[in-house]
Swiss-Prot record:
This is Squamosa promoter-binding-like protein 1. InterPro entries: Ankyrin_rpt-contain_sf, SBP-like, SBP_dom, SBP_sf. The keyword Electron transport does not apply. Its main location: nucleus. The lineage of its organism: Eukaryota, Viridiplantae, Streptophyta, Embryophyta, Tracheophyta. Zn(2+) 2 binds at C148, C151, H155, C167. The keyword Zinc-finger applies. Gene3D superfamilies: Ankyrin repeat-containing domain, Transcription factor, SBP-box domain. The SBP-type zinc finger is required for the binding to DNA. Disulfide bonds: none annotated. It comes from Oryza sativa subsp. japonica (Rice). GO terms for molecular function: DNA binding; zinc ion binding. Residues 72-87 have a biased composition (Polar residues).
């Protein structure tokens, strides 16, 4: 075998490429990529070329995939068998800086300075001194280990029984051989053990492929030989003469042709499921399953949200660079999944290329993927028309299954097992919503998330913002028993959207949790859901645990759905060409989001949803946007919830000046929600509020609308039976409601004279009130008060005292002397008559003869 690689290839730089997470397109960020992104093809003759380029981790040297797996397995000098420790970091076995001279091998235990140059070959090969091979506990990279005498390697301390020098797995194998346990009928323990060993060996092969870029020159030299040993062990475990042919040609073609056939021809690693032909196109139709009947809420506006789930699929493509992606990669993924994803986005990062695809699929589709991941990976390869999926090594993780293929042939399909102890679990993150253009301090709590083999990733907007080892982020102040806590800070751009926090181990298995980036008022409301998502506070003894888990699932589904909503809105707002613009958000899912926000009284979220709706971001199922909104009956829902803040927001919300209903001209702003809107049987929100006994605040909000429609409708709006909201309140005995609204009417509308007409022939009483307007003009408004359930058709009986009084008043009105003007005229006439009588009558004057006449008088003396 040649001396290894002549020249190390360098991994592509993430900063040299711009990745479109929606279109699945990679474009160089500069005119010419930097040297570190170019593939160097210098290889030695006769070398095994697995199509793997060497990698150089740019973010953190400790996270180098090339250092993760080079020493993950070793060859036993006695029998040639290979035993592997999954998930071990090769940094544990690399020489510690400053502990010994770099000219010779040294012990890998922390603080050990023993030079192994003069030690036995056994100690050199395993990089351990004689003392530490017999030690009960040693520390490697500050983690407790113990050297296994049978595996000839270090294992984590928890893999040993107390006082034992061999790990539990080796002891179990030894005990089975020693005791010769009789195998029950139908159970083949040896075959199960061989399958387990085969899986481990293939996984070690995967790790070795990831670790060809080890920094040590000796490791580069032994890399191809080490792969050959892995292939030999794989063939030995397969146990067939056909697979022994791989010993002759230890290259990728031989591995693909033989090992791929071993898996594909029914020798499944996990079950005896018959193989499904890959070449035939299978339609992803929903299987006939028993529908859930219990716990079905008839009032739920959107049931589909419970039947879809957002999850991810991870691919690791060896020997590939971003420019190897075809232009129709997104179309290939959608065709592979039979166009079932309703939403999809992707992220890439070096190593060689790790492609993470988040998608929203129906639950039945996720179940089909989990039931037979090997079939679906083979289908992806068979449908491909380019070399991306057909050449080189490809690792894929579909939910809890790992697959490995080479040159289009499937080699491995295995359920994922944790590297250390139990599986990882994210219990809670905070905050779940971050304001745009801000820096957030995240806290991640979980189980088994801080391990030597795990790292934390924070992704947003198609980019990886954080890639750090979890041990560096571990909060030392919270190292008590129980969940582990990771803390880190991250800055976000001014764009809104949805991101993920991932905890990943070196097997590429990872957990993720969503978070939202939006306006501050929107984030402050969404953060109120954190207590529902906190699994740390859940106690197994709680009676209502199932209800809490259901509420958590609903809140988590809202985060995913609102995240997809923000993603589509951002894409539509920033797309330069129509082809890049995705279709609008589905109306049914929008109704579910709106219903959830109204149920939680998220006023800022409702405003965000409505603004996007009027900007054309939703595919409506009706012609008019206003009609779509009014059909949701938001005011009625707010009144039934007795939510005064929500009513205040709805009554003051106006449409923006953005084009509505797809028209080119901007529609004028208008108030969408009014308190006098009529519902079934012409009942208004005022009628409903008047019937409740604890809705004084709600009624106060309904009568405080900007257009003053509430106080006008209080006595005028009638339902199908002719009753007003005031009648509803009076019948329920809510006099305080009547007094409150009447005070508003008196204070906001000027007082006027009231004329009352009483008639013996009328059956009703009419009140007419005249109000002066701001322009000093009077408008007459009639308030008809109907008492009783129905208006009686019989005339009411006349009052016995009213008839004589009316007749008396009528008689007095005809007597003119009672009027002051007539009396004055009579007095003047009487004076005139008296003067006339005096003038015409002959007065008797003493001393004069004859009658005295006025006309006989002379004027002046003679």
């Amino acid at each position: 075998m040649s001396s290894g690689l002549k020249k190390k290839g360098l991994e592509w730089d993430l900063n040299d490429w711009r990745w479109d997470s929606n279109l699945f397109l990679a474009t160089p960020s500069n005119a010419s990529p930097s040297k570190c992104s170019r593939r160097e093809l210098g290889r030695a003759e006769g070398e095994i070329d697995f199509g793997v380029v060497d990698k150089r981790r740019r973010v953190s040297p400790e996270d180098d995939d090339g250092e993760e797996c080079i020493n993950a397995a070793t060859t036993n000098g006695d029998d040639g068998q290979i035993s592997g420790q999954r998930g071990r970091s090769s940094e544990d076995e690399m020489p510690r800086q400053g502990t010994c001279s770099s000219s010779g091998p040294c012990c890998q235990v922390d603080g050990c300075t023993v030079n192994l140059s003069s030690a036995r070959d056994y100690n050199k090969r395993h990089k351990v001194c004689e003392v530490h091979t017999k030690s009960g506990v040693v520390r490697i990279k500050n983690v407790e280990h113990r050297f296994c005498q049978q595996c000839s390697r270090f294992h984590f301390l928890q893999e040993f029984d107390e006082g034992k020098k061999s790990c539990r797995s080796r002891l179990a194998q030894h005990n089975r051989r020693r005791r010769k346990v009789q195998v029950q009928a139908g159970v083949d323990v040896n075959s199960l053990h061989e399958n387990h060993s085969l899986s481990n060996t293939l996984l070690l092969l995967l790790k070795q492929l990831s670790g060809l870029d080890s920094s040590g020159p000796s490791e580069q030299i032994n890399g191809p030989n080490y792969l050959t040993n892995l292939v030999k062990n794989l063939a030995a475990l397969a146990g067939t003469q056909r697979n022994q042919d791989m010993l002759k040609n230890a290259n990728s073609a031989a591995i693909a042709s033989h090992t791929g056939n071993y898996v594909a021809k029914g020798n499944s690693l996990h079950d005896s499921r018959p193989h499904i032909p890959v070449g035939t196109e299978s339609t992803a139709e929903e299987p006939t399953v028993e529908r859930r009947v219990q716990n079905f809420d008839l009032n739920d506006a959107y049931v589909e949200g419970d039947e879809n789930r957002t999850d991810k699929i991870v691919f690791k493509l060896f020997g590939k660079e971003p420019n190897d992606f075809p232009s129709d990669l997104r179309a290939q993924i959608l065709s592979w999944l039979s166009n079932c994803p309703s939403d999809i986005e992707s992220y890439i990062r070096p190593g060689c290329i790790i492609l993470t695809i988040y998608m929203r699929l129906p639950n039945w589709m996720w179940d089909k993927l989990a039931a037979d991941p090997a079939h679906w990976i083979q289908k992806l390869i068979s449908l491909s028309t380019d070399t991306l999926w057909r050449t080189g090594w490809m690792y894929a993780r579909v939910q809890d299954y790992l697959t490995l293929s080479c040159n289009g042939n499937l080699m491995l399909a295995s359920p994922w097992q944790p590297a250390i102890g139990n599986k990882h679990q994210i219990l809670f993150i905070t905050p779940i919503a971050v304001a745009c253009s801000s820096t957030a301090n995240f806290s991640v709590k979980g189980l088994n998330i801080a391990q030597p083999t795990t790292k934390l990733l924070c992704i947003f907007g198609g980019k990886y913002l954080i890639q750090e080892a979890t041990e560096k982020l571990l909060d030392d102040t919270k190292m008590q028993r129980g969940p582990q806590c990771l803390t880190f800070s991250c800055s976000f751009p001014s764009t809104s959207g949805r991101g993920f926090i991932e905890v990943e181990d070196l097997d590429q298995s990872s957990l993720s949790f969503p978070f939202v980036v939006a306006e501050e008022d929107v984030c402050s409301e969404i953060r109120t859901l954190e207590h529902l998502l906190n699994l740390v506070s859940f106690d197994d003894t709680l009676v209502e645990k199932n209800d809490l888990l259901a509420s958590r699932d609903r809140a988590l589904n809202f985060l995913h759905e609102f995240g997809w909503f923000l993603q589509r809105s951002h894409i539509r707002a920033t797309s330069e060409t129509p082809k890049d613009c995705t279709e609008g958000f589905p109306a049914a899912r929008f109704r579910w989001l709106l219903s959830f926000a109204v149920d939680r009284e998220f006023c800022a979220v409702i405003k965000k949803l409505l603004d996007t709706l009027f900007q054309g971001g939703v595919d409506l199922d009706v012609q008019s946007t206003v009609e779509f909104v009014l059909k949701q009956d938001l005011v009625f829902v707010a009144v039934n919830k007795r939510s005064k803040p929500l009513i205040d927001f709805l009554l003051t919300y106006t449409t923006s000046s953005a084009p509505m209903d797809g028209t080119e001209s901007a529609a004028p702003a208008q108030f969408l929600f009014t308190p006098d809107i009529a519902g079934p049987s012409d009942i208004t929100p005022l009628h409903i509020a008047a019937t409740y006994s604890d809705t004084a605040g709600v009624l106060d909000a309904l009568t405080d609308d900007p257009q003053q429609l509430g106080i006008k409708a209080w006595k005028n709006a009638r339902d199908a039976t002719g009753l007003t909201p005031e009648d509803y309140a009076r019948k329920r005995g809510h006099e305080s409601y009547i007094e409150m609204v009447q005070n508003k009417i008196d204070s906001r509308l000027p007082k006027a004279h009231v004329s009352v007409t009483i008639s013996s022939t009328t059956s009703t009483t009419d009140f007419t009130e005249k109000h002066a307007s701001q322009s000093k003009t009077t408008d007459q408004t009639a308030f008809d008060v109907e008492k009783g359930q129905q208006i009686s058709t019989k005339p009411p009986l006349s009052c016995r005292q009213c008839l004589p009084e009316l007749a008396y008043r009528h008689h007095l009105n005809r007597f003119l002397s009672t009027r002051p003007a007539v009396l004055s005229l009579v007095a003047i006439a009487a004076v005139c008559v008296c003067v006339g009588l005096i003038m015409q009558g002959p007065p008797h004057i003493g001393g004069m003869r004859g009658p005295f006449r006025w006309n006989s008088l002379r004027s002046g003396p003679k």
